[in-house]
């Protein structure tokens, strides 16, 4: 770590947040109060100073379940600032991964911000996908799918070993962020899903064909945001192209609609045309598009 990239002392958090958020002091002060009120840690708020000691960039790492973290960086306006921000990110990443608590750091960038994306890739991040966020009302009429021969939809929990095996099968030749699963340990992925939002095993569904686990839908609830989220949705390779994706999704939406939350969200790789068509057919609309980038402590590639 170089001596110009440093964690921010508590007394200096307000100016660092101004730089990070690109907002004026009054607005940043309200954000700081909100962070403190909601218990959001700022221990991983970092700054980059120039040779004169002036603040030139800021970054924040927020830890997430499953040994992951999300990165936020200050706006980048020119090449000089880009170079400084790259050095800041490298120092933050080195520090975060060195203690063994974080294996994967994720960033969502603007598709047309070439300077920002170059900074992330120069800092070691991998461009995974153009991620499409979609939303639909959770108050729409949702009916359970009709029964299919030899197909069972169950929310009865299965053993971790069986779930990890099923998840691994759904990653095979997947069109949805195909490189991401290689950057994490399977148990961390499962733990992350369980700790995302308010975990309710009754909102998780396993699809079985003749008693064999063949697909999974993981829905989590986030009351604070008044929403549900399809955190993961996938079919094993042998179960695809049989109409079972629609069958599983309809069941997941039926379960979600029993909850009081206003909306239901999901994210999908823009290259996953079959999934985009399925979600659109069920009333999901595109909200945002972001470039998903990641940096892993594991020696893997996409």
Model-derived regions, located:
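Acyl-donor-binding surface of acyltransferase catalytic domains
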Residues: 79-150, 155-157, 293
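Conserved active-site alpha-helix within GNAT-family acetyltransferase domains
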Residues: 111-129, 242, 246, 270-288
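A short beta-loop-alpha structural element at the N-terminal edge
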Residues: 1-17, 150-167, 172-176
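Conserved acetyl-CoA-binding loop-helix of GNAT-fold acetyltransferases
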Residues: 81-95, 235, 241-258, 276-281
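Conserved hydrophobic beta-strand within the GNAT/NAT acetyltransferase core sheet
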Residues: 105-109, 230, 264-268
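Conserved donor-binding loop and adjoining core beta-sheet/short helix segment
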Residues: 32-96, 209, 217-228
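C-terminal "cap" of GNAT-fold acetyltransferases
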Residues: 132-151, 262, 267-273, 288-302
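Active-site rim helix/loop that mediates acceptor-substrate recognition in acyltransferases
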Residues: 21-51, 60, 180-213, 218
């Amino acid at each position: 770590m170089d001596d110009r990239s440093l964690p921010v002392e508590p007394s200096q958090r307000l100016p660092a947040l101004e730089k990070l958020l690109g907002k004026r002091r009054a607005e940043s002060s309200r954000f700081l109060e909100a962070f403190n009120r909601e218990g959001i840690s700022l221990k991983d708020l970092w700054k980059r100073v120039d040779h004169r000691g002036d603040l030139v960039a800021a970054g924040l790492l927020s830890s997430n379940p499953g040994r992951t973290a999300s990165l936020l960086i200050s706006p980048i306006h020119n090449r000089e600032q880009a170079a400084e921000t790259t050095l800041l990110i490298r120092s933050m990443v080195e520090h975060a991964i060195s203690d063994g608590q974080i294996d994967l750091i994720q960033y969502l960038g603007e598709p047309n911000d070439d300077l920002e994306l170059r900074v992330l890739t120069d800092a070691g991040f991998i461009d995974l996908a153009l991620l499409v966020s979609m939303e639909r009302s959770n108050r729409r009429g949702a009916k359970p799918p009709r029964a299919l021969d030899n197909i069972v939809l169950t929310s009865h929990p299965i053993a971790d070993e069986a779930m990890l095996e099923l998840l691994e099968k759904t990653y095979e030749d997947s069109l949805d962020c195909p490189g991401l699963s290689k950057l994490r340990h399977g148990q961390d992925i499962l733990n992350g899903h369980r700790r995302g939002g308010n975990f309710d095993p009754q909102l998780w569904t396993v699809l079985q064909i003749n008693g064999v686990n063949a697909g999974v839908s993981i829905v989590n609830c986030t009351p604070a945001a008044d929403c549900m989220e399809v955190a993961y949705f996938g079919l094993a390779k042998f179960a695809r192209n049989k109409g079972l994706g629609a069958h599983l999704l309809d069941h997941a939406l039926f379960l979600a609609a029993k909850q009081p939350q206003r909306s239901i969200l999901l994210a999908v790789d823009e290259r996953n045309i079959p999934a985009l068509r399925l979600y659109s057919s069920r009333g999901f609309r595109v909200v945002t598009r972001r470039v998903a980038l990641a940096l892993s402590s594991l020696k893997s590639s996409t």
